[in-house]
Amino acid sequence: MKKLTLLALSAAAVGLTGCASLTGGKRIVRISHAQAETHPEHLGLLAFKEYVEENLGDKYEIQIFPNELLGSAQKAIELTQTGAIDFVVAGTANLETFADVYEIFSMPYLFDSEEVYKAVMQDTDYMERIYESTDEAGFRVVTWYNAGTRNFYGKSPIKTPEDLKGKKIRVQQSPASVAMVKAFDAAAAPMGFGEVYTAIQQGVIDGAENNELALTNNKHGEVAKYYSYNKHQMVPDMLVANLKFLNSLSDEDYQIFKEAAALSTQVELDEWEKSIEEAKRIAEDDMGVEFIDVDVDVDAFKQKVLPLHDTMLQENEKIRDFYDHIQEVNQKVKGGE
């Protein structure tokens, strides 16, 4: 089965190699992402498509491929590197391989609040320094999407770190996320997002960690009936572009694509809160998921993993400046309360 998947991806890559091909005189621009067509990220990308085609419709046709149709995020990043795909939405954990600075987003309890998280991410001038860190790899982030707050969910209630002891939990393929779960005395199981449902269903893992949309959009609420708000990470998704494609654009066209990216983020942010509330309603009413909030000992979770901050800073000097910047924003927002 694995061989067939690899062959299919290879065939897709070959088929996409002519990505710069024209249809009716228009340059085809392909965007890959892992989410369903109802997901806020897809809605944001539809706004991206509409804006580009309204302004440059005589030159470009935007094609969006949801649901990992062109492969997992990691595979799609590799295709974006080669130019077989022009854009891909990827988690920061997928970008750590190419630029060490992205590891910081896997640091647990990095942002003191959602207000801090958004203040940092919306500081475009500062974030562009981070975005350019992958230039040598052949791609660059052009904007971010809110991927919410990551929490644990599984087959049994999780209220304290002790409830995770001995459990096998799916995490993103990030060393920091693996270390975090180990700090809770659980076994980390890095795997592709598309494998999680079956892994929980078959008892290969006991749970996972993600935002609430995973329960409904990816049907995880059918196999995991307890969702606990321990709030260990706020991790954005990134819209990544092939650098050669960006550099091939005229100044005027580049500006349109830049505006389209910013618009896609705004649409995604506007849709996010509505989607979360709807996901919670569906998960609770239709899937029987229990949401555990006030009974979760967030501070106990936090104290278990705070030593990871020092460990990560010692092992990766490239995150130091960004870490200090975030701490400054933490203090600034706290002081303004």
Functional labels for PLM-detected ranges:
Residues 1-2, 303:
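Generic cytosolic/nucleocytoplasmic N-terminal low-complexity/intrinsically disordered segments
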Residues 2-21:
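Sec-dependent N-terminal signal peptides of Gram-positive bacterial secreted proteins and lipoproteins
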Residues 20-115, 125, 134-135, 140-337:
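N-terminal secretory/targeting leader peptides
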